[in-house]
């Protein structure tokens, strides 16, 4: 059904935006940590990512370097105290520069419950509104996201904000203590604005990306 909805051979393939490859250290040790994390939290004995969703984030920092350095350091995160360290596949700076930090076939720790299935895109900024109002950053974000949707046949329903993670049908978490963990960035109202802009861009390339995600009960308070 998803394949039919996407019909995703677009009339015109969305162009690949300019991406600066700036990898964080992700050698054998971190890969092994990611594999162990995946086994603990998803029951998947692998660090290999097969993208089925895209999660949008806000860095809560005012500079690219601050976010990059946080992701580069493979240390236990301050919130959940696990390895590997947190990371995202992309960071989009306020001037619209897209940096890729991690290969798209490798899982990254950016969203509890969805790291097994989702590409993570971070936007340098302090709020959803700031990112939505930054023309250069928003243009790059939409161009990157629509290209990834086309490449991996990801429907609009699986392009979500971090704050929407618990309602994703792809969400799964084996650790009960983590099952309801999420963050405040990219609330549904802001993501509805973002997704509406994506739909406009998708039409330009003849892409039928399907409907937006439905609200689902999360079982969390």
Task: Describe these PLM feature segments.
Residues 14-30, 48, 127-221:
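Basic/polar, cationic surfaces and motifs that engage anionic cell-wall
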Residues 54, 112-123:
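Short coil-to-beta-strand
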Residues 9-111:
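N-terminal catalytic cores of peptidoglycan-degrading enzymes
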Residues 2-10:
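Sec-dependent N-terminal signal peptides
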Residues 71-75, 107-109, 115-118, 140, ...:
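General N-terminal targeting signals
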Residues 59, 124-126:
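Short strand-loop junctions, especially beta-strand C-caps/beta-turns
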